[in-house]
Design a protein with these regions (language model features):
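Conserved PLP-enzyme active-site core in the AAT-like
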Residues: 197
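C-terminal helical "lid" subdomain and adjoining coupling/linker elements of P-loop NTPases
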Residues: 185-192, 203-247, 290, 429-431
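Intrinsically disordered, low-complexity regulatory segments
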Residues: 1-168, 172-174, 465
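Conserved short loop/turn motifs at secondary-structure junctions
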Residues: 1-3, 108-110, 187-190, 267-276, ...
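OB-fold/S1-family RNA-binding modules
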Residues: 49, 100-105, 232-247, 251, ...
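Metal- or metallocofactor-binding catalytic centers and their adjacent structured scaffolds
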Residues: 242-278, 284
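Basic, low-complexity terminal or inter-domain segments flanking catalytic cores
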Residues: 2, 25, 80-82, 87, ...
Length: 586
């Protein structure tokens, strides 16, 4: 018998169906020589100090090191944190399945986290059987069948596991040590300081405080209106005035002028290529911008669409497609373009020469998110919105460039320079799909066709006006901005950022106010406690991902990486210890 382990029941059942393992048992499927079982996510974790008998932590015990054993996932109950009974029961079922089989196939997520989940499970249950890896990027019948026909040796992914395990141990080192230390220093118990969670909360709070403390300032803009061919063109003075009297002086000068002179006319055309296909971060940003869906909603929805075989693996950081994946897309596009709403674009798509920024080797765990071409069937409103974004972006990538003409006109009026910038679309190309012209507008310039002007030409001034401009406070973070900030700052990965937001919500550090993410009183109190500390600084661990990538490539060892992390932990706990000393020795 061959055992197959997945990390979700739905995925396990789908693989079992394709393989003919159609007999349902408690916690697994069996048949046709296979036993397919599953975990409920990651059911194992590194042990905590209390699990190894450490009842009380003293300053001399720092830095704390992770015990060498794993424990079953704990959940909060009325009696405190206890082992998850559902995880315990499923682990017994998995052990039964694995003990009954000669070979084990790891069918967990084809990613760092999925690899670590299987390796930890394999070690925890003390398995000895040979193991193979199923590595697929979609759950279509074809992908599963092809993957099973080309199983890979597990040792090929040793470096991937080392990277995941290193990240897991580093998170434990920094999170547990800083949490225990801050609790001991300032009595801030029942709270955790995660290496990503804390700087993200600090940034949300910093921006919230900046908004609270904001003082508005006024400036004044002067506009002149020119008239040609019965068309009014409004131009703005190139500088804003901080004092009204200077704006008023220029306004008076312009009112006294009958004609302005065209100083320069610049027209340029540009072919703008379609955006690359989505990764999860870009999809979360667009779904929040256009449909007000949260990052958590988008991750959950895409996982559901993946399990329904409608899209490829969603938790990817890549926006690239390898050549072999690209070669499958004409057949996928044929299915899409047969749909009524997309039939008009059939003649516009071109698969003959893949764009260089689309077809590439060396993607991360998975290629960009694309549709599989399977009929979507019945989807709820939110699923349909996300699916349409992915579908449209997949189609956009293989349509012609959009041609845009940008025009800048400079005018001299009352010896001062005024300017206007506009654009117009000459050929829509990929812009035909969603029509989102803000993607091509430079600096928010308007779309407008201007009359023909020539340098030196006098043009009648039809009016002028002054506009007061008041600075506005920065808005709290939206999910679009927050995941973008985390991405730019190197905080977390595409597959972990959503869980960081989820954790902050569950621990009541943050909440939603409409579309904005704002801190709670508890979150602000926590922020005031750690503000200025290294543990709240994004730079503390922003280089981790680059080092983890080097471990994955075999260029850095786990010992070297964790040695550097341990030095960071000593800095963090040392800083907290100094706070403790100052508190007790005022």
């Amino acid at each position: 018998m061959i055992a197959i382990v997945t990390d979700r029941p739905n995925v396990g059942r789908e693989i079992a169906r394709v393989l003919g393992a159609d007999r349902k048992e408690n916690g697994y499927m069996t048949g046709n020589g296979y036993m397919v079982t599953w975990t409920y996510g990651n059911m194992l974790s590194l042990a905590m100090p209390k699990d190894s008998g450490t009842a009380r932590v003293e300053w001399k015990d720092f830095p704390l090191l992770p015990p060498s054993f794993l424990t079953v996932r704990h959940v909060k109950t009325d009696t405190g944190w206890n082992p998850d009974i559902n995880a315990l029961l499923q682990l017994k079922i998995i052990a039964k399945v694995l003990n009954a089989c000669d070979t084990i196939i790891a069918a967990t997520d084809a990613s760092r986290e999925g690899e670590m989940l299987f390796r930890h499970l394999y070690g925890f249950l003390e398995c000895k059987q040979p193991s193979l890896r199923l590595w697929i990027s979609s759950l279509t019948d074809e992908a599963i069948t092809e993957g099973m026909a080309s199983l890979l040796p597990c040792d090929r992914f040793d470096n991937l596991f080392q990277a995941a395990d290193s990240r897991n141990r580093a998170d434990w080192l920094l999170g547990v040590n800083s949490s225990y230390a801050i609790c001991k220093a300032v009595g801030f118990g029942n709270n955790s300081l995660g290496r990503v969670q804390t700087p993200v909360l600090a940034e949300i709070c910093r921006r919230y405080r900046e908004r609270e403390n904001f003082l508005p300032a006024d400036s004044w803009q002067v506009f002149v209106s020119l008239c040609k061919d019965r068309q009014i063109i409004k131009l703005r003075h190139t500088e804003d005035f901080q004092e009204y009297r200077y704006a008023s002086e220029l306004y008076g000068d312009c009112k006294a002028v009958r004609n302005a002179r065209i100083a320069a006319v610049n027209r340029e055309s540009e072919d703008i290529r379609a955006p690359a296909p989505y990764n999860l971060t870009e999809l979360q940003k667009d779904a929040n911008r256009y449909h007000n869906l949260t990052a958590i909603q988008v991750q959950d929805i895409t996982q559901g669409l993946y399990e329904k075989k409608l899209i490829s693996y969603p938790r990817t950081a890549s926006r690239l497609l390898t050549r072999d994946v690209y070669d499958t897309l004409p057949a996928v596009m044929e299915k899409i373009l047969s749909r009524k709403e997309f039939r008009q674009y059939a003649k516009m798509t071109d698969f003959a020469a893949p764009p260089s920024d689309i077809s590439a080797q060396g993607t991360t765990d998975h290629h960009a998110i694309i549709v599989t071409g399977m009929p979507p069937g019945t989807l709820n409103k939110e699923e349909q919105l996300v699916y349409t974004l992915i579908l449209g972006r997949t189609l956009e990538a293989f349509m012609p460039s959009c041609r845009v003409e940008y025009t800048t006109i400079d005018v001299v009026c009352a010896a001062r320079k005024f300017s206007v910038q506009t654009y117009r679309v000459l050929k829509k190309g990929w812009l035909s799909i969603f029509g989102r012209e803000h993607l091509i507008a430079r600096g928010g310039m308007p779309c407008s066709a201007l009359p023909d002007f020539s340098p030196g030409e006098p043009v009648p001034v039809s009016g002028c006006n002054i506009v007061r401009k008041r600075t506005l406070p920065v808005s709290p973070y939206t999910d679009e901005e927050l995941v973008g900030y985390m991405d730019r700052s190197g905080l977390g990965t595409v597959s972990t950022r959503t869980n960081i937001i989820r954790t902050l919500l569950e621990r009541k550090y943050i909440r939603y106010s409409g579309k904005y993410v704002i801190p709670t009183p508890k979150g602000l109190f926590f922020y005031e406690t750690v503000c200025g500390m290294k543990v709240a600084d994004t730079s503390l661990t922003s280089g981790w991902e680059a080092e983890l990538a080097r471990i994955e490539q075999g260029k850095l060892t786990q010992e070297e990486f964790l040695g550097g992390v341990l030095e960071q932990v000593k800095e963090v706990t040392g800083e907290i210890f100094r706070i403790y000393q100052a508190k007790n020795n005022p």
